[in-house]
Amino acid sequence: MYHLYSHNDLDGVGCGIVAKLAFGKDVEIRYNSVNGLNAQVQYFLEKAKESNRQDALFITDLAVNEENEERLNEYVHAGGKVKLIDHHKTALHLNEHEWGFVQVEYDDGRLTSATSLLYGYLIENGFMKPTNALDQFTELVRQYDTWEWERYDQKQAKRLNDLFFLLSIDEFEAKMIQRLSTHDEFFFDDFEEKLLDLEDEKIERYLRRKKREMVQTFVHEHCVGIVHAESYHSELGNRLGKDNPHLDYIAILSMGSKRVSLRTIHDYIDVSEIAGRYGGGGHAKASGCSITDEVYELFVAEAFRIDPVRPDAFRNIYNLKGSANGSLYENRAQMRFFLFPLDNEWNIQINGETQDETFAAFEEAEWFIKRNYAASLVRDEVFVAFLAENLKLANQHRK
């Protein structure tokens, strides 16, 4: 008998689907949260010891703690079979054990996923044969879990994850197993396509609303965008990161589950290291941790007093970013920032006072005022009134 304990996200459930296609009724699968795995593993090992059974155990997309690390060693030394397959770099130390198989990226530089690693492992060890449909499915899971879908605009990968969240785990699992075992190609049926189109519209409305709720602050040395959200963390983190490139990372708080999701679009930030400070982990661009007392104070209590950042005006005709006529910004404290080009450099005027520091590019000047003052591009009518007032003052000085 095989047992597979996996994460309860798309990549984790993808492992369960692959395992059921390989082992059929001979595998028992349980999906766990990050915090729930260790209790599950401990219970399995205790029951195995009591019954003197040595079933094979797969652990995928999750890592065990030190106590279970030792217990798994004892189980293997007693004749039990264990294989832990993961792709998070925070689990690389488990490769010290013969039962550990942790690989962050392939030889060609592509990032791995637990589903793609398990699929490759089962094929290599003769447990299953590859198919076109499974190749396509596991690749979509990998692309979504590693954010590669966003880089190459692979919307099918995102839609697969959307479908995963629209269905129960049991229903999603059953649909995928039936489809992958009876078709040569992976596809969404007509009903799913319509359902996913409606979901796209719903997500877009949700992202627009949450964009207006984000606050900005410094947490230690990093400039962070903080927002409370229960859904669509990947899409939200990606959108907020792209719209606010001056932010080092986005922290998405889910108070119901007492979890924080950390997302970044930058290569110079590794949010798995940040999550590691608070007992969490994950990938360089997507990680998470529990809301401990320390995390609550930093990301909830202190941020609660801060007003949300106003989004940049997006329907302007005149007040445009990088315009030769200048660009006008304002923050919640009613401070005004006028960015204008002069002698091949960009200058900043704060409340009418031109600053000594200049910038080689508009993006650098905007990054400075957004990061340090949480400024936002104002609407055209405010910009036109500002120009009219400055023109009036200039004419008065000439007189």
UniProtKB/Swiss-Prot annotation:
Q: Per the record's keyword annotation, is Acyltransferase included, yes or no?
A: no
Superkingdom classification of source: Bacteria
What GO cellular-component annotations does this UniProt entry give? cytoplasm
Phenotype of gene-disrupted mutants: No visible phenotype. Cells show normal growth.
PANTHER family xrefs: 3',5'-CYCLIC-NUCLEOTIDE PHOSPHODIESTERASE, OLIGORIBONUCLEASE NRNB
What is the recorded function of this protein according to its Swiss-Prot or TrEMBL entry? Degrades RNA oligonucleotides with a length of 5 nucleotides in a 3'- to 5'-direction. Less active on shorter RNA oligonucleotides and on those with a length of 24 nucleotides. Prefers RNA oligonucleotides containing adenines rather than cytosines.
Q: What is this protein called?
A: Oligoribonuclease NrnB
Instruction: Look up and give the organism this protein is from.
Output: Bacillus subtilis (strain 168)
Lineage of origin = Bacteria, Bacillati, Bacillota, Bacilli, Bacillales
